[in-house]
Amino acid sequence: MALGDKNQGSSKSQAKQKGTKGKNAQPRLKSNQLKRLKINEELKELQSRVDNFVPPSEITLFSELPMSSKTQKGLKSSHFLNPTPIQSLAIPPALQARDILGSAKTGSGKTLAFLIPLLERLYLEKWGPMDGLGAVVISPTRELAVQTFMQLRDIGKYHNFSAGLVIGGKPLKEEQERLGRMNILIATPGRLLQHLDSTVGFDSSAVKVLVLDEADRLLDLGFLPALKAIVSHFSPVQTAPGSRPSRQTLLFSATQSKDLAALAKLSLYEPLYISCNKPGEEGVMPANLEQYYAVVPLERKLDALWGFVKSHLKMKGIVFVTSGKQVRFIFETFRRLHPGLPLMHLHGKQKQPTRLDIFQRFSSSKSALLICTDVAARGLDFPAVDWVIQLDCPDDVDTYIHRVGRTARYQSAGTALTILCPSEEEGMKTRWGEKAIEVKRIKIKEGKMGNLKQSMQNFAFKEPEIKYLGQRAFISYMKSVHIQKDKSIFKIDALPAEAFAESMGLPGAPQIKLGNQKAAKVRGPSKEELARKAEKEEEEEEERAVVGSDEESEEDESEGLGSEDEEEEIDDEAEEIDDEEESGEESGSDEETEEEKDASKPKAPAVRTKYDRMFERKNQSILTPHYTALIAHDADNAAGAGEADDDDDVFTLARRDHNLSDDEEADTDAILGAEALAAELKKPLITSEDLSKRKLKAAASKKGLLKSRPGPEKVLFDEETGEAREFYKSGVDVEKEMSAADKRREYLEKEREIMKIQDKIDKEVAREKKKELKRKRKERERELRQMEMGDEPVAYLGGDDDYASADEGRSLSPSPAPSLEPERHAKKQRRGGVQESGAGDLEDEEALALRLLQGS
């Protein structure tokens, strides 16, 4: 009954619950809808926290900031717990969609100060894969863009955004296919502008966050027109009053300049100025940085650097020089000297995979030396850099600040050393004083400096490539000093050019024409200059040879316009124009008449096809026309402008007026015609001038050289005399000697004689072995017979010592091997079950044992 009542009561309660559900219950929701509602509630709560957030006086943890759980989780997994001063000041207003213009010392964490607001803004906007591009970060160099991308990937790995890297050095078509799927884009300005202008379907009107990293460097590289064009593609900043701006702009830099104000007016809307420096100390140095400078003559700078490297073999350092030509020259020469420290080099002319590989290898190395240009001076965070050596004087104090900022990052210690020429000391000290930067002077002892003069001369003498690199490095350094604006520091007349060239292993200073090339780095060559250069290349082969070979390499490597490569390419163009003008003057351009000048007026450049570019290819090694032009300059200076070159092996014959008869003249003409025809036939049908650069490279490769070289010769050495003789002989020598059948017969006879001698020796050895075995068998039989007869064994001491010593242990004991009769007899006795034993046998055995013991 109780069980029935219980069941009845439960059924009633279930019916009651069903009735209530049918009247008051809400409709059932799917899991996706619940998840969406939960996300919306979290976003509303986060937005209210951001709007109502009042930053405290000091923020010590990232968890105190109003950020999403995904960003907090990414920061914690990357071990970012405590914000730096610039981060604690810039992140709270940036989270509220304010435009920021921030300035802080190098290594203070400016990258996180704009990456965190970028992620939070897109997260609050519910940005998804179908929304397109939402944030853009513009960096001045490729390496800095790669570093920013890696940092974004670490802290944003828990978000669902797609990020991409668009820099030079990669095919444009591959990047165009991926642009439509990117939410966050990190790019260099040149390549980004190229995509904005040419990529079909690339919509950038919905960008919510624009970041300009190292903005002053972007302006120094002449990217202001490109930045104006890029900003024009994005959505406008101003919106309705009281609402959130449609686009937020964050601008960060380590130094402030006048041009930043123009850029701020262009892209920022009511910006908030944030600076972690004290008033009047913009660009102040890190507290843990020790700064020194040394005054060294120009011709001893390489000696000072070599001595420093040899005395710091366990350090991790960066050496800054002015141009990529100097980087290559120092790297190639120091590499051949084997300093005992890993050497790496980085400059703007390298291919992008090579630059990334060097960047990663140097970052992961504990001790290494990186020789580089200013391409690595901005924003790159190399861990644990101990020394920064500036072998060349920096352009200005801002460049100095960014160079030395590669060490002493955040709270780590570092040391900076600047090597100045005597003429640069006073001007640089004045500029340091204006920025309140204290740099101590040190003196390098003579014993600590190296002596590379003889080694450099040997390298230049043995390897023409090193000599060519030295000439280009010398020219690029002198031109970089010439185009500097601050003439109180850079005085080209005070530099010892001849001594500097001699220290680089050169026989003399190369000829340089320093024309009035104002603002050459900014504007590049004009259209008239390019047209004049094309006209001269078509007219004279000599002038075409003077033009440098770097033009083709620049065309291949300058796919990415937004990088440090642009500045170096413009420098090389200006250098080629100077060389061309110099060669034009040497070839007699001063003697042109008015008619020739009118005829050589620049024409409108025609369309260049791929076949035109194919015929314009030039060598890029020591066979470059520019290198031959440098050699020609030296020869002209030595022999005079009007004299012929000594290297020419062609004799010029002057015709004399002799009284010749008609027959003699006819004979002479016939002889001369035959000689000319023979000389013409001796000439090759195809010369190197008729081949393309690809064919010349293939001929210079290992495979091509092996084809042109003669085959290897096999040499045999006589076993008796040791004399070498050829394995293969010519047909005449073979005919003089005996035939092949006679040689085989002679060889077989010699081998038969040798085999007969060996057979005799083998037979004698076999005969001796048989005799010895027979003798040993007879000895054992004799011993056994004596033991059976009861006599004492006889020890034979004569004969061979080897056999006596070998049988010494067993000569006194019976061996069962020679005869099996005792064993058979014993077996028969055991088989019969009766074994005769008696006192006589036992006594005999005891006596035998006693005799054996006494005999032994």
From Swiss-Prot:
GO molecular function: ATP binding; ATP hydrolysis activity; identical protein binding; RNA binding; RNA helicase activity
ATP-binding found in the keyword field: yes
Known catalytic reactions: ATP + H2O = ADP + phosphate + H(+)
Record's subcellular location: Nucleus, Nucleolus
Listed InterPro entries: DEAD/DEAH_box_helicase_dom, Helicase_ATP-bd, Helicase_C-like, P-loop_NTPase, RNA-helicase_DEAD-box_CS, RNA_helicase_DEAD_Q_motif, SPB4-like_CTE
Coiled-coil region(s): none
SUPFAM superfamilies according to UniProt: P-loop containing nucleoside triphosphate hydrolases
Listed Basic and acidic residues bias regions: 525-536
Keyword Transmembrane in record: no
Region (Disordered) residue spans: 1-34, 509-612, 768-856
Enzyme Commission (EC) number: 3.6.4.13
Entry keywords, A to Z: ATP-binding, Helicase, Hydrolase, Nucleotide-binding, Nucleus, Ribosome biogenesis, RNA-binding, rRNA processing
Bias-annotated ranges (Acidic residues): 537-597
Intervals of motif DEAD box: 213-216
Chain intervals with Polar residues compositional bias: 7-17
Domain of life the protein comes from: Eukaryota
Domain Helicase ATP-binding as annotated: residue spans: 91-274
Feature: compositional bias, Low complexity: 811-820
Leading EC class: hydrolase
Domain Helicase C-terminal: 288-460
Domain notes: The Q motif is unique to and characteristic of the DEAD box family of RNA helicases and controls ATP binding and hydrolysis.
Function, in words: ATP-dependent RNA helicase required for ribosome biogenesis. Involved in the release of U14 snoRNA in pre-ribosomal complexes. Required for pre-rRNA cleavage at site A2.
Family: Belongs to the DEAD box helicase family. DDX10/DBP4 subfamily.
Protein name as it appears in the record: ATP-dependent RNA helicase DBP4
The species this protein was found in: Cryptococcus neoformans var. neoformans serotype D (strain JEC21 / ATCC MYA-565) (Filobasidiella neoformans)
